[in-house]
Curated annotation (Swiss-Prot):
Its EC number is 1.97.1.12. InterPro entries: PSI_PsaA/B, PSI_PsaA/B_CS, PSI_PsaA/B_sf, PSI_PsaB. [4Fe-4S] cluster binds at C559, C568. GO terms for biological process: photosynthesis. GO terms for cellular component: chloroplast thylakoid membrane; photosystem I. Phylloquinone binds at W671. P700 is a chlorophyll a/chlorophyll a' dimer, A0 is one or more chlorophyll a, A1 is one or both phylloquinones and FX is a shared 4Fe-4S iron-sulfur center. Pfam families: PsaA_PsaB. It is an enzyme of class 1 (oxidoreductase). This is Photosystem I P700 chlorophyll a apoprotein A2. It is found in: Plastid, Chloroplast thylakoid membrane.
Length: 734
């Protein structure tokens, strides 16, 4: 018999039902569960797949560069970044006739095009690219890297080049390589690019391979470096009247501490960013030399962790046993990596708009909104994944004997206290926040808005004041105009910072009031509830009072038969499943808040947000309903406009989202009967019956139906909001 899918599991391949396909897809990446897997093959498969992932990333970024060079308008955008709309790529086949062709022909293009809201134009411009040829060169280089990555992945699966398990578990060498080799060297290389190419480019000097050895990045060359007069590199920075991309008002400094933003581009000073990357490079190059490898000097991770026993005895045996637990569990390591990556992705979202790094991106409002929302959603999925793999670690890899009385075991021992505290925090936040919103709703409904309960966020305002915001009148730390810190800030360090904080047209320390106070606590409710579900799922993954033997059932079990009440819906997978709904809900509130606050800031009517955000009807009517009007008018009796594609996506997103409920709520047997009926009709229809249906249809398992429902819910939710966000922002700001 020919090999059937899935090849990695003979048991599944012989299953005569549709389970074969579903379970095959579900376990394709669960290498640990495959036939004939060994620890060595497991590590080698994961290692090789990393190269495949890199190849895909390089191919994708190469495609971005290639399509903009081929079909975009980069060169004309560079001439006037604030008024030319950047083109992502052409639309080959615009449906709906001539009106569609006209609606989508913009940005100076000859035919229908898509506008870029990803910020790549601003990024490429900032780092010194200027022509289509530059973009093609970059695309080819990344294509080359993609091919190299594929070859490397294939190579490391060949017997001669397969690394051993001991190589994968050599924590110190990996730390040194990642810290120095990846972070340190790449940050240093990026500093080099900024100093040699980007900064001269911002001053009208076009540096390429043919002249980069002749153009001095700084008039004094390397002299100040070798004589220790490093401050010379900071002297004569670009002036406030500097026109980006020209020599007008340009200085000669390459590494500065100006603070604040370039007045024309509204982005951070390139010379500040070069300085930042140089400092990062230095720190990581040092950090990558701290761990003991071939030379018998430096730290051993195991010794470090074994020594971490707090003397008070309140953490028991501290970190004893953690080294082997972490180093031998891929799921623990993946959980740590996902948690870190999730947090950093959310930080990227917060910093991209408040401290924009790319020239003119702060004035491209739709791009700002799209990038913020994109990074927050990505962060949410990555963070929930961290807890999922934490739970799998507890089920598959945790060894109680190895971790006796250390911090990990103690966390499991007092999980009731952790879970109940999180529960209490969630209940407190939920009831109080909803109570305030609903009270305010009722007051407005009864025509007595002055009876709202409006709470000023005085602690947050105090923190903003401490960082230099003067409008609240707190007169503390950096906002105290006669204090030593304030005076030093004016002259020695970051003189531009205080100007930027108090300039009301950017997004640094937005002025906050009662509406912000309420939505902050609504978001806190979402964060705490999501965390509660995820933490409970992981801490109860091995067992609970109700089901002490839970770990024997694996990560995703539906129930333990009809004879054991209460064992349904309590697997670690169910916790992940529930948490994703809360995560999406929370990020919905976060992005609504960000978007509405910024729309009113950009339009110059901040009072609309301040007055309407203190009650729920305000959010529903003045944010969602009011801003969806343009979107819904993408098609109307008079024809169509360039928002029509978002109108269609908005409807389609709702459709996908609603489809999710059919799987989340319907009986699963309904689907089995439906599929059987379709199969019956299929086999009795000429031509169609040439393709035989081999697998007997069986109902989706409970877990599968939930997964399909969750996938539709998530995808539909994000599609719907993406269309709303882009249409409502681009419809207002051209």
């Amino acid at each position: 018999m020919a090999l059937r899918f899935p090849r990695f599991s003979q048991g599944l391949a012989q299953d005569p039902t549709t389970r074969r396909i579903w379970f095959g897809i579900a376990t394709a990446h669960d290498f640990e569960s495959h036939d004939d897997i060994t620890e060595e093959r497991l590590y080698q498969n994961i290692f090789a797949s990393h190269f495949g992932q890199l190849a895909i990333i390089f191919l994708w970024t190469s495609g971005n560069l290639f399509h903009v060079a081929w079909q975009g308008n980069f060169e004309s955008w560079v001439q006037d970044p604030l008024h030319v709309r950047p083109i992502a790529h052409a639309i080959w086949d615009p449906h709906f006739g001539q009106p569609a062709v006209e609606a989508f022909t913009r940005g100076g293009a000859l035919g229908p095009v898509n506008i870029a809201y990803s910020g790549v134009y601003q990024w490429w411009y900032t780092i010194g690219l200027r022509t289509n040829e530059d973009l093609y060169t970059g695309a080819l280089f990344l294509l080359f890297l993609s091919a190299i990555s594929l070859i490397a992945g294939w190579l490391h699966l060949q017997p001669k080049w397969k690394p051993s398990v001991s190589w994968f578990k050599n924590a110190e060498s990996r730390l040194n390589h990642h810290l120095s080799g990846l972070f340190g060297v790449s940050s240093l290389a990026w500093t080099g690019h900024l100093v040699h190419v980007a900064i001269p480019g911002s001053r009208g000097e076009y540096v390429r391979w043919n002249n980069f050895l002749d153009v001095l990045p700084h008039p004094q060359g390397l002299g100040p470096l070798f004589t220790g007069q490093w401050n010379l590199y900071a002297q004569n920075p670009d002036s406030g009247s500097h026109l980006f991309g020209t020599s007008q008002g340009a200085g000669t400094a390459i590494l500065t501490l100006l603070g604040g933003f370039h007045p024309q581009t509204q982005s951070l000073w390139l010379t500040d960013m070069a300085h930042h990357h140089l400092a990062i490079a230095f720190i990581f190059l040092v950090a990558g030399h701290m761990y003991r490898t071939n030379f018998g000097i430096g730290h051993s991770m195991k010794d470090l962790l074994e020594a971490h026993i707090p003397p008070g005895g309140r953490l028991g045996r501290g970190h004893k046993g953690l080294y082997d637990t972490i180093n031998n569990s891929i799921h623990f390591q993946l959980g740590l990596a996902l948690a870190s990556l999730g947090v950093i992705t959310s930080l990227v979202a917060q910093h991209m708009y408040s401290l924009p790094a790319y020239a003119f991106i702060a004035q491209d409002f739709t791009t700002q909104a799209a990038l913020y929302t994109h990074h927050q959603y990505i962060a949410g999925f990555i963070m929930t994944g961290a807890f999922a793999h934490g739970a799998i670690f507890f089920i598959r890899d945790y060894n109680p004997e190895q971790n006796e009385d250390n911090v990990l075991a103690r966390m499991l021992d007092h999980k009731e206290a952790i879970i109940s505290h999180l529960s209490w925090a969630s209940l407190f936040l939920g009831f109080h926040t909803l109570g305030l919103y609903v009270h305010n709703d009722v007051m407005l409904a009864f025509g007595t808005p002055e009876k709202q309960i409006l709470i000023e966020p005085i602690f947050a305002q105090w923190i903003q004041s401490a960082h230099g915001k003067t409008s609240y009148g707190f007169d503390v730390l950096l906002s105290s105009t006669n204090g030593p810190a304030f005076n030093a800030g004016r002259s020695i360090w970051l003189p531009g910072w205080l100007n930027a904080v108090n300039e009301n047209s950017n997004s640094l320390f937005l002025t906050i009031g009662p509406g912000d106070f309420l939505v902050h606590h609504a978001i806190a409710l979402g964060l705490h509830t999501t965390t509660l579900i995820l933490v409970k799922g992981a801490l109860d993954a091995r067992g609970s009072k109700l089901m002490p033997d839970k770990k024997d059932f694996g990560y995703s079990f539906p129930c333990d038969g009809p004879g054991r009440g209460g064992t349904c819906d309590i697997s670690a997978w169910d916790a992940f499943y529930l948490a994703v709904f809360w995560m999406l809900n929370t990020i919905g509130w976060v992005t609504f808040y960000w978007h509405w606050k910024h729309i009113t800031l950009w339009q110059g009517n901040v009072s609309q947000f301040n007055e309407s955000s203190t009650y729920l009807m305000g959010w529903l009517r003045d944010y969602l309903w009011l801003n969806s009007s343009q979107l819904i008018n993408g098609y109307n009796p008079f024809g169509m406009n360039s928002l029509s594609v978002w109108a269609w996506m908005f409807l389609f997103g709702h459709l996908v989202w609603a489809t999710g409920f059919m799987f989340l709520i319907s009986w699963r047997g309904y689907w089995q009967e439906l599929i059987e009926t379709l199969a019956w009709a299929h086999e009795r229809t000429p031509l169609a019956n040439l393709i035989r249906w081999r697998d007997k249809p069986v109902a989706l398992s409970i877990v599968q139906a939930r997964l399909v429902g969750l996938a539709h819910f998530s995808v539909g939710y994000i599609f719907t909001y993406a269309a709303f966000l882009i249409a409502s922002t681009s419809g207002k700001f051209g």
